[in-house]
Amino acid sequence: PYPSSWDELQNNEGWELVKETDRVLVYSKLLPDSPIPALKAEILSDVKMEKLVDAAWLVEKSTVVFPNAFIIDAGVYHRRSDSSYTAFQVFDVPFLSPRLYQFNSIRFGNSIHWVRTDTLRTELNPENHLLPPVNFGSWVVTQGENKSKLTYRVCTDPGGHVPHWIINQANQRYLPQMLEDIESFAGKK
C-alpha cells in the first residue's frame, strides 16, 4: 500500500527550489510522513525516454548506475513479474552506519514507484544494518519536444541519530550527481 502522503509527493504543488545546477533542479517540501523534507529533482536529457526508465529499473546494477551514491550492494529479493519486484540497496555514507533500504517497486510504462517494505524476514539483514523508517518515491520520464525529462521524487528518513541539516545538505549535493550519473549510464546502453 502507498503511504498517506504519496499523492502529495507526486503532485507539483508546494515545491520550493533549493538547488540549481547547470543541468538539474532540486526542490523540497515537507510531508507529514518524515521530519526531513521530501525532494524532487529534474533533468532534461538528450537520452531517449525508454533508456532512462530502463536504467532506473536496473536496481541490481545500482552500484554501476549510481557510482557516486555510496551504494555498496543492491539486488532483487523477489521478482513477481517483469514490472514488479522486491529489492534492496545498502548505502554506506561516510561517518554514518550503513543503511539497508528494502522496498517494493512497480513499473508503469515510463514511471517507477517504490515503497519501503517491512515485511521481510530478518535473515535478509544478516549484518543488522539500520532500516530506514520512511522511504518511498518515484522515477518518471516524460518526452518533450526534443528532450526527455527525468523526474526523481523521494520522501525518506534514514533513521538513526543524524542531524537533519546534514541530511538536507547531503541530499542537495548528491541528487544532481545522481541524475547526471543515471543519464550517463543510460546514454551508453
Predicted regions and their residues:
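Eukaryotic helix-grip
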Residues: 1-189
